[in-house]
């Protein structure tokens, strides 16, 4: 009778090139381009993109890794990621807010009863910038928010130089934001999702 304890594990030897073929085959089974809500498992990839995009410019990040995990656990439906062959290349993370204007608390809180989606961060991987991906993702995200009956508007804060970019999507400046980060100051912008639906119908997107 064969004693299984005497069996020794042996390495599996594949023909030359087989492993490369299998890896390629696995990649080819992934969708070339996919949009989906993020999960806590996507947090590390999102933070790496965000850190590279923001630290070099402003010295800080809108969200740090534990905060990303926090929001993707509480409200993953308020996020959207763009994946190319399974790799995250751009994303937006949001949460619900229940006051008219943003406050320091809004940076870390999710208010389930709120009607306002607070966009914490939009970031694009460095190799995919200057290709219009941020614009496409933001259109899709606003459309995604519009499909959620509880969400009536979107709000964000940005530096003055980015205000014209967001105005193209129906956002309107409502004045200086009460939030400051170090020496950085921001403009607060709001967008009615009803207004966005009109713009989208007339944009050809």
From Swiss-Prot:
Induction section of the entry: Exhibits night/day variations with a drastically increased expression at night in the pineal gland.
Modified residues (Phosphothreonine): 29
Position of the signal peptide: none
Top enzyme class: transferase
EC number: 2.3.1.87
Tagged with keyword Transport: no
Annotated site residues (Important for the catalytic mechanism) in this chain: 118, 120
Primary location: cytoplasm
Tissue expression remark: Highly expressed in pineal gland at night. Expression in the retina has not been confirmed. Extrapineal expression could be strain-specific.
Catalytic reactions of this protein: a 2-arylethylamine + acetyl-CoA = an N-acetyl-2-arylethylamine + CoA + H(+)
Positions of post-translational Phosphoserine modification: 203
Superkingdom in the source lineage: Eukaryota
Residues annotated as binding acetyl-CoA: 122-124, 130-135, 166-168
N-acetyltransferase domain boundaries: 33-194
Self-association and partners: Monomer. Interacts with several 14-3-3 proteins, including YWHAB, YWHAE, YWHAG and YWHAZ, preferentially when phosphorylated at Thr-29. Phosphorylation on Ser-203 also allows binding to YWHAZ, but with lower affinity. The interaction with YWHAZ considerably increases affinity for arylalkylamines and acetyl-CoA and protects the enzyme from dephosphorylation and proteasomal degradation. It may also prevent thiol-dependent inactivation.
Function: Controls the night/day rhythm of melatonin production in the pineal gland. Catalyzes the N-acetylation of serotonin into N-acetylserotonin, the penultimate step in the synthesis of melatonin.
Other notes: Pineal melatonin synthesis is severely compromised in most inbred strains of mice. In C57BL/6, a polymorphism activates a cryptic splice site causing the production of an alternative form containing a premature stop codon. The predicted resulting protein would lack the putative catalytic and acetyl-CoA binding domains and therefore would be inactive.
The protein's name in its UniProt record: Serotonin N-acetyltransferase
Originating organism: Mus musculus (Mouse)
Gene: Aanat
């Amino acid at each position: 009778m064969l004693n299984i304890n005497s069996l020794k594990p042996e390495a599996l030897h594949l023909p030359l090139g087989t492993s490369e073929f299998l890896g390629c085959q696995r990649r080819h089974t992934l969708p070339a381009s996919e949009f989906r809500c993020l999960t806590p498992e996507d947090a590390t990839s999102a933070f790496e993109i965000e850190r590279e995009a923001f630290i070099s410019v402003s010295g800080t990040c809108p969200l740090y890794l534990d905060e990303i995990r926090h929001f993707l656990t509480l409200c993953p439906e308020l996020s959207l990621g763009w994946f190319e062959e399974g790799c995250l290349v751009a994303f937006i993370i949001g949460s619900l807010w229940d006051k008219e204007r943003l406050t320091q608390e809004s940076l870390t809180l999710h208010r389930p009863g709120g009607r306002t989606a607070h966009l914490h961060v939009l970031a694009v991987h460095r190799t995919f910038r200057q290709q219009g991906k941020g614009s496409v993702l933001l259109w899709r995200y606003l459309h995604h928010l519009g499909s959620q009956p509880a969400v009536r508007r979107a709000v964000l804060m940005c530096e003055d130089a980015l205000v014209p970019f967001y105005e193209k999507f129906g956002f309107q400046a409502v004045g200086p934001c009460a939030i400051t980060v170090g020496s950085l100051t921001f403009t607060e912008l709001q967008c009615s999702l009803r207004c966005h639906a009109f713009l989208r119908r007339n944009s050809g997107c």
